[in-house]
Structures are given as C-alpha cells and as structure tokens.
C-alpha cells in the first residue's frame, strides 16, 4: 500500500481488526520512510458496478462518493455513525445483489432515499433536495407536505 504522505510503496500493517460495521477490515499502517501512520479499510466487492448517469455517461460506482453524499445529508443529525455505516453497507450490498452490473443513477438515488426515510426525515429531505434538484422553497413545501399525513385543521 502506497503511503499517502510520502508515496513510499513499502508500508507495514501494525494492527488489523474487523471494522465496526463487521463487513470490512480496518488496518492501521505505518510508513518506515516518513513515519506516517494511516488507516485503510478492506471490503469484499461482489461485482464491479457501473453507474449510468441521466446524461447516458457511464462511470464506475464509487462507494466513497455515495458515503459522502449520505453523510452530508446527515450532518449535525443525532444519528450513530455506526448506524450510518450499516446503512451504507446495506445499500451497497443491495446494489451488488441486484444481479446487474449497470445501474442507473436514478435507481441508486431511490434506494438511498428509501433507506434515509427509515432513519431520519430531515436527512431524507436534505438528500431529496439535491437528488430531485429543488429550485425554490415551494419545492420543499410540496415535498414535505407529501410526507405529512393530513392533520385536521392544518389547511
């Protein structure tokens, strides 16, 4: 593994253990050239997934990109980080087990929204605002009103 600090290709594993999500291995590494320490994660990848964008462009599925967008939607929310990791791993497993190597970005977005809706409605609305490209406050109002059950006298 190449050292992210100095580029040395000869690093050493100092500690290896299951990560909190129990679907990956966490490794602490040390670079003898610069003394840098860093962490890597090893995960099983069932198949190489390709994302088909709405423009028709194809790109390799990037778990880190998925994780970043989910974590942004959950920023400052009272959600256990381990629960977020489990949700992300569940989404990736679901995508990999679909039997398809090509998956539309719209399909991925719907799966993420479904998972977020079960965990936190604020994160769900945040993600939806980007995914559905809200342009005005009315877009938020319409989306949130569809979430709420009809409340008597709330007209």
Curated annotation (Swiss-Prot):
A zinc finger (unnamed) spans 3-34. One of its GO terms (molecular function) is DNA binding. Keywords: ATP-binding, DNA-binding, Metal-binding, Nucleotide-binding, Repressor, Transcription, Transcription regulation, Zinc, Zinc-finger. Residues 49-139 form the ATP-cone domain. GO terms for biological process: negative regulation of DNA-templated transcription. Binds 1 zinc ion. Signal peptide: none annotated. Its cofactor is Zn(2+). The keyword Cytoplasm does not apply. Belongs to the NrdR family. Negatively regulates transcription of bacterial ribonucleotide reductase nrd genes and operons by binding to NrdR-boxes. PANTHER family: TRANSCRIPTIONAL REPRESSOR NRDR. This is Transcriptional repressor NrdR. It comes from Roseobacter denitrificans (strain ATCC 33942 / OCh 114).
């Amino acid at each position: 593994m190449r050292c992210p600090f100095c580029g040395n290709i000869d690093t050493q594993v100092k500690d290896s253990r299951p990560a909190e999500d129990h679907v990956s291995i966490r490794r602490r590494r040390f670079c003898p050239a610069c003394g840098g320490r860093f962490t890597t994660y090893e995960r099983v990848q069932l198949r190489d997934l390709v994302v088909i964008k709405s423009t028709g462009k194809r790109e390799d599925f990037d778990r880190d990109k998925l994780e970043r967008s989910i974590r942004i939607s959950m920023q400052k929310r009272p959600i256990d980080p381990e629960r977020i990791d489990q949700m992300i791993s569940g989404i990736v497993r679901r995508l990999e087990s679909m039997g398809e190597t090509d998956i539309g970005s719209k399909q991925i977005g719907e799966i993420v929204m479904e998972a977020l809706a079960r965990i936190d409605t604020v994160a769900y609305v945040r993600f939806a605002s980007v995914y559905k490209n809200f342009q005005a406050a009315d877009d938020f109002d319409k989306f949130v009103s569809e979430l709420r059950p009809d409340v008597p006298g709330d007209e």
